[in-house]
Amino acid sequence: MDINKHRYYMMQVLLAIFRHPQLSSLLAFKGGTSLMMFHNLSRFSTDLDFNLLDASKTEYVYNELHSLLLKFGTIDDEAMKFYGPILVLNYGKGERMLKVEVSNREYPNHYEVRSLLGTD
């Protein structure tokens, strides 16, 4: 796997979500990749995980993510799971695929807005 290429596509997808007028306010970035990016976690995480902040928007978010990811490649696999959508982006033959997972579980979580590499 070309780590730099994978990181590039992760950042492009994150930026596209951040710039989307609705998705940016519906998704909270979480998981190993967010820890790697914001807290310099030493292990390389290869997927993008989000919490959905409004569970009633699950279908809408699924459809919007599907359209958004098609700008970067093809959707190799996708499913609407019990706890939310999972989409797998294939951005090039022979490359590792990028999994995007959204959880619609409702937790008493607290989120903070953070800037990533000057993207705000």
Regions found by a protein language model. Name each.
Residues 1-30, 34-120:
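Compositionally biased terminal segments of proteins
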